[in-house]
């Protein structure tokens, strides 16, 4: 049977009595929601949960101890919620409520209910209700979860900002069409972005200027965004929002097409990647592009693989932007060491094996020459080498010379956290040989330390780790 269509309605229950029949966990959740909106819950049940008992003792709720009685509805009740696990009690409460023309919700029973309690997303005064009409509540709950991740707290602050100036806005724009256009302009402007960055004073200034018809010109800005490593699912919610607000996206070579497809369709995408073997864009040219587009009033996203502040030259770019007076923000990402290790089943720290972690860049010989190899050769630490494929023979030689045991296990992770991921394992003695045997190519991350041996039985993503046979001994 198809349920009747429901009329969506928000009720003001502040200082109004609501009868909740039942004293279990479901009744507790309903009561907690009622308390949040200032209602006066009356709980009718033989016994209560610990929380309901505490609320009754502190006077937050009224308890009618016992089984449901029709007389409970003689107390100027506005709404009845039946939330027991006894169908006969729920039926009795519903019949009595219907007889007095009261709204009643019987949990998980459409036929006995004349109102449904929706799934709700709350952001301050902003409330979004989702209902399936009671027929498929899991659909409503699933959609609520999706909205929870998309709508951050700044929307609640924006709602409050507008509500505080409601009378001023209505007086300034008495015509409803003019008022609608004003709101549309402000919602598409910088207000919400400023509130998300906790810049409340600037947001208020923008709104006041708009009401005074002296709009403040929104300056361009640059957001450094970490795209994470490999799997597009590692992108953070803030990173996704930035991509959907961008006018220009300056992206690195290692950023996947899947991530770029999540960006706003109208955004211009410009590759500015660097490569050890192919075409590279100079850092000075990247600075120029950021400056040029920001000066044009555009929202620029500087999209980097991994995290902007882990071997991503993010610090240099912020110093440049600060010098030139360009507003900026930083959205961190999951760096390659964390992503690759997780997808290979390698805990970077472990109580029994490693108490410290080193992140090391090895993209050129000069980087390797400046390292303190004696410190890196110490045991009970995990080493992660970024951009080190070409330097693997040097890494092996210098660590062995510094005293790191040749039997120290390693994992070489190629295309980490991607569908093409390969994990190669061995010992320090076989490092260069293994990379050569399997023709390892960038992007690849080297993890060295006792924890890497755990990949053999903790791996969960892609194929099992591979290892090369030991190289033949040299004949002297």
Swiss-Prot record:
BP-aspect Gene Ontology terms: cobalamin biosynthetic process; methylation; siroheme biosynthetic process
Cysteine disulfide partners in this protein: none
Phosphoserine modifications at: 132
Region (Uroporphyrinogen-III C-methyltransferase) location: 220-476
Classification via CDD domains: SUMT
Alphabetized InterPro entries for the sequence: 4pyrrol_Mease, 4pyrrol_Methylase_sf, 4pyrrole_Mease_sub1, 4pyrrole_Mease_sub2, CobA/CysG_C, NAD(P)-bd_dom_sf, Siro_Cobalamin_biosynth, Sirohaem_synt_dimer_dom_sf
Keyword Transferase found: yes
An MF annotation (GO) of this entry: sirohydrochlorin ferrochelatase activity
Active site per UniProt: 252 (proton acceptor), 274 (proton donor)
Record key words, sorted: Cobalamin biosynthesis, Lyase, Methyltransferase, Multifunctional enzyme, NAD, Oxidoreductase, Phosphoprotein, Porphyrin biosynthesis, S-adenosyl-L-methionine, Transferase
Pathway stated in the Swiss-Prot or TrEMBL entry: Cofactor biosynthesis; adenosylcobalamin biosynthesis; precorrin-2 from uroporphyrinogen III: step 1/1; Cofactor biosynthesis; adenosylcobalamin biosynthesis; sirohydrochlorin from precorrin-2: step 1/1; Porphyrin-containing compound metabolism; siroheme biosynthesis; precorrin-2 from uroporphyrinogen III: step 1/1; Porphyrin-containing compound metabolism; siroheme biosynthesis; siroheme from sirohydrochlorin: step 1/1
Catalysis: reaction(s): uroporphyrinogen III + 2 S-adenosyl-L-methionine = precorrin-2 + 2 S-adenosyl-L-homocysteine + H(+); precorrin-2 + NAD(+) = sirohydrochlorin + NADH + 2 H(+); siroheme + 2 H(+) = sirohydrochlorin + Fe(2+)
Binding site for S-adenosyl-L-methionine: 305-307, 310, 335-336, 387, 416
Protein role: Then it catalyzes the NAD-dependent ring dehydrogenation of precorrin-2 to yield sirohydrochlorin. Finally, it catalyzes the ferrochelation of sirohydrochlorin to yield siroheme.
Protein name: Siroheme synthase
